[in-house]
Amino acid sequence: MKVTPLGERLLIKPLKEEKKTEGGIVLPDSAKEKPMKAEVVAVGEKVENIDVKVGDRVIFSKYAGTEIKIDDVDYIIIDANDILAKIEE
């Protein structure tokens, strides 16, 4: 299934967080914070005020967007204004 965000929205895929602490303690899902880093999967046609493209890694607002599941994969549809930064490695 192909999903194309409308207007000034992006489709992002949250990045998996480490399940262990530095001390080796395994964290259950209920103890982990919601991830705030994601990879851009699709960009709406009216996104103009930020410089992101498919494949970029970004940091987004903690409670932003609408969570959806496509083919058993979690995604978030988010407004372009909720993108806080681009991660460059």
Curated annotation (Swiss-Prot):
<dbReference type="InterPro" id="IPR018369">
    <property type="entry name" value="Chaprnonin_Cpn10_CS"/>
</dbReference>
<dbReference type="GO" id="GO:0005524">
    <property type="term" value="F:ATP binding"/>
</dbReference>
<dbReference type="GO" id="GO:0051087">
    <property type="term" value="F:protein-folding chaperone binding"/>
</dbReference>
<dbReference type="InterPro" id="IPR037124">
    <property type="entry name" value="Chaperonin_GroES_sf"/>
</dbReference>
<comment type="similarity">
    <text>Belongs to the GroES chaperonin family.</text>
</comment>
<keyword id="KW-0963">Cytoplasm</keyword>
<dbReference type="GO" id="GO:0044183">
    <property type="term" value="F:protein folding chaperone"/>
</dbReference>
<protein>
    <recommendedName>
        <fullName>Co-chaperonin GroES</fullName>
    </recommendedName>
</protein>
<dbReference type="GO" id="GO:0051082">
    <property type="term" value="F:unfolded protein binding"/>
</dbReference>
<keyword id="KW-0143">Chaperone</keyword>
<dbReference type="InterPro" id="IPR011032">
    <property type="entry name" value="GroES-like_sf"/>
</dbReference>
<comment type="function">
    <text>Together with the chaperonin GroEL, plays an essential role in assisting protein folding. The GroEL-GroES system forms a nano-cage that allows encapsulation of the non-native substrate proteins and provides a physical environment optimized to promote and accelerate protein folding. GroES binds to the apical surface of the GroEL ring, thereby capping the opening of the GroEL channel.</text>
</comment>
<comment type="subunit">
    <text>Heptamer of 7 subunits arranged in a ring. Interacts with the chaperonin GroEL.</text>
</comment>
<dbReference type="Pfam" id="PF00166">
    <property type="entry name" value="Cpn10"/>
</dbReference>
<dbReference type="InterPro" id="IPR020818">
    <property type="entry name" value="Chaperonin_GroES"/>
</dbReference>
<dbReference type="GO" id="GO:0005737">
    <property type="term" value="C:cytoplasm"/>
</dbReference>
<dbReference type="GO" id="GO:0051085">
    <property type="term" value="P:chaperone cofactor-dependent protein refolding"/>
</dbReference>
<dbReference type="GO" id="GO:0046872">
    <property type="term" value="F:metal ion binding"/>
</dbReference>
